[in-house]
From Swiss-Prot:
Main location: cytoplasm
One term under GO cellular component: mitochondrion
Descriptive protein name: Transport and Golgi organization 2 homolog
Protein family (similarity comment): Belongs to the Tango2 family.
Compartments, record wording: Cytoplasm; Mitochondrion; Golgi apparatus
Keywords of the record: Cytoplasm, Golgi apparatus, Mitochondrion
């Protein structure tokens, strides 16, 4: 289970406004090996965490490059996983390293969607000179990817904007923080967005999540019903905030759990300016 909230406006009216504000949680088993976010790839142009699970190493759930490519992934809640399916994390890694634009890449992915367990992917080209393009594809939804219109979106483990209660609740909190963003110091905005991502209020009952996950036992589904998931061996282990301002300056903040210990966290922030 993961969750992403984002707002994008390629041409903000105010010079103090952000072109992109993104807040995301990675939910995963605490013992799944991964690397904290850092730069990698040709000329160290890509910034992301990396999955280090055997057979899936090198994939990622969220990343951005200095060239302005951004990718984000969530899994689709389904009871039965195909054990021989390809690793979904490669979808983001391949986009970040490719020369394809976001829509062309997702069109290619859509022809191969059947090779993977359920997923959603956001792919974006962020360009200060040409304008920003953000696209979406889910292999359990429409057969073709779509180009998103500027606005505010929520994505969890169903299709984009599926009204799970926790998604609607978290999106409202996200929008309240975003509405103040121009007046807030950047560090205060990041703190408020991290507060949104760490909200553990279960949004129950939720017929939508129960219907999609009907083969799961109820206590498990109930654990998934908050923005921040907290179980004994599984849950939210990474918070990420990405801000892109009107001039293409990127602030990437990652807060990650250390050593499978829910009381120990490390926060790192990276900043750079888009090359495009």
């Amino acid at each position: 289970m993961c969750i992403i909230f984002f707002k994008f406006d390629p041409r903000p009216v105010s010079k103090n406004a952000y072109r992109l504000i993104l807040a995301a949680n990675r939910d995963e088993f605490y013992n799944r090996p991964s690397k904290l976010a850092d730069f990698w790839g040709n000329n160290s142009e890509i910034l992301s965490g990396l999955d280090m699970e055997e057979g899936k190493a090198g994939g990622t759930w969220l990343g951005i490059s200095t060239r302005g490519k951004l990718g984000a992934l969530t899994n689709y809640l389904q009871p039965r996983q195909e054990p021989d399916a390809r690793g979904r994390g490669e979808l983001v890694s391949h986009f970040l390293t490719s020369d394809m634009d976001s829509l062309s890449y997702l069109k290619k992915v859509s022809t191969e969607g059947h090779l993977y367990n359920g997923f959603n992917i956001i792919a974006a080209d962020l360009s200060t000179s040409k304008g920003d393009v953000v696209c979406y594809y889910g292999n359990r939804g429409e057969p073709e990817p779509i180009v998103l219109t500027p606005g505010t979106y929520g994505l969890s483990n169903a299709l984009l904007e599926t009204p799970w209660k926790k998604l609607c609740f978290g999106k409202q909190l996200f929008m309240e923080a975003v509405e103040q963003s121009e007046a807030l110091p950047k560090d205060v905005l990041v703190t408020q967005l991290l507060d949104v991502l760490n909200n553990e209020e279960a949004q129950l009952p939720d017929p939508a999540i129960e219907d999609q996950g009907q083969e799961y036992v109820q206590p498990i589904l109930n654990k998934y019903a908050a923005v921040c998931v907290r179980c004994a061996t599984y849950g939210t282990r990474t918070n990420t905030i990405i801000l892109v301002d009107a001039n293409g300056h990127v602030t990437f903040t990652e807060r990650s759990m250390l050593d499978k210990d829910t009381s120990r966290w490390e926060t790192n922030t990276y900043e750079f300016t888009l090359q495009s």
